[in-house]
C-alpha cells in the first residue's frame, strides 16, 4: 500500500510539472507577441525620426518615459537590431543623439532589480552609446554597479566602462574589484 501511495504522489508531481510547462509555453507566446508588437511600434517611430534626421525634445521625452520599463527597452533593442542593417550610419547617428535619454535612464535603472540593472549596461555597451565620452554621473553609477553582488551586473558595468575608454574610471573599477 505504501508503494502505491508513493507512485500516485510521483504521478501527481509529474502531471503538475507537465501542466506548469504547458502554462509557461502559453505565457511566453503571449509575451513574445507583445514584444513583437512593441518592437514594430518602435520601428515605425525610430524609422520616421531617422528619415527626418532630427531627434526632437518631444521624441526624447517619449523615449525617456517608455524606456523606463524593461519590456519597452527590450522592444527598443529589437527595433534597433532590425534597423541597423538597413541604415547603419543613420541609426548610429540617431543613437548618439539619444545620449541625454540614456543618461536619464541610467539613473532610473540604477534603482531597478539586479536583472534589469544588468540588462541596461548591456544595451549601453551594445550600441556604444557613451563611447569616447565619459560622462561623470553615468560613470559614477556604473562604478556603483561594479559594487553589486550580482556577477552579471558587475560584468556588464565593467564592459561599459572599458568600452567608454576612460583610463581613470577603468582604474577605479579595478580598485573596487580588488577590494
Predicted regions, residues:
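Core helices of alpha-solenoid repeat scaffolds
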Residues: 97-103, 135-139, 170
